[in-house]
Amino acid sequence: MDGLHTELALGLIGCCGGDGQQQTAPFVAKTYQMVCDPRTDALVRWGRDNNSFVVVDPAAFSQLLLPCFFKHGNFSSFVRQLNTYGFRKVHPDRWEFAHESFLRGQTHLLPRIVRRKKRGEGGGGGGGASCSFGGGAGEHQVAAAAASVGMSGEEEDAAEDVLAKEAALFEEVQRLRHEQTAIGEELARMSQRLQATERRPDQLMSFLAKLADDPNAVTGHLLEQAAERKRRRQHLPSHEPTVCPLPPAPPPQPPQPLLALAGAAAMDGTYWWTTEHHHHHHHQMKPMTVLPSLEPPTASCGVHQVPELGGGGVMGLTTDGEAKVEPPFPFCLLGQAFF
């Protein structure tokens, strides 16, 4: 792990050698490492006399630092472990802990910090704190330390429970503070939205009053705003897809002439009408005038009865040789018509 203290990297957590040297407990070694690392002084640091350490920000300490060294981020569990190893809280208003063997730069004293045995484990101890050091000298030192503070085993257990409960309450208070902050921010946002909603009817009524008093001024103001928005859109790069212009529409088709009725033949652009003389039994071709269509090709058109030519005749178009007949109203207004 990066950032290990030099003394810890050199073997702060050692194994028992042949001379019976004890090893430092992993919890104690990791705690010493956290306190000694200058990069974590904003969260935890040494006390004024270098014989204690202070957790400056327990909430950030639990969230950022504890998970890097331990398998949890529970501050109350960390405090409970400190109590198990004989640390005590030395200041009522801040999280400052001390141990007689937890001193800055005195790494050779760390193996003396061991987990205390529960009551009933081990045979000695009398009224003192029952801790095991693996040697008579260590037991004597622990007993002397317990006697110096004047605490029995039951009192130490009670103090441990009180500190654990205090740490748990502190964590709960921190959680409630975070929730309160989040709720306050949400209420502020809702208040802003509510105020904006309440202002809209007043703005609408004011606009309607101005429109009723001077419609031209309001219309001119709206036109100015629209022109300003248009100028802004022209200056800003457009993110809308480019629309290709449509091709021009084809020119309209010229009107189609009426098709000749049955019996007419087209020659050199002039329709010819066939008349039949019943008496002489021969055919005669006369030219017919072609009139452009005045209505769409789908519309129906009428024809006029052509007088009999030489004793007989059929329905057809007007010939050039005959006098033009005046068409009825309203066709006479068009200048030319079907008849």
Curated annotation (Swiss-Prot):
Coiled coil spans: 154-217
Hydrophobic repeat HR-A/B: annotated segments: 176-212
Example of a GO MF term: DNA-binding transcription factor activity
Localization terms from the record: Nucleus
Modification after translation (UniProt): Exhibits temperature-dependent phosphorylation.
Keyword Hydrolase: no
Function (record text): Transcriptional regulator that specifically binds DNA of heat shock promoter elements (HSE).
PANTHER family, A to Z: HEAT SHOCK TRANSCRIPTION FACTOR, HEAT STRESS TRANSCRIPTION FACTOR C-1A
Family designation: Belongs to the HSF family. Class C subfamily.
Name of this chain's protein: Heat stress transcription factor C-1a
Native source organism of the sequence: Oryza sativa subsp. japonica (Rice)
Taxonomic lineage from the root: Eukaryota, Viridiplantae, Streptophyta, Embryophyta, Tracheophyta
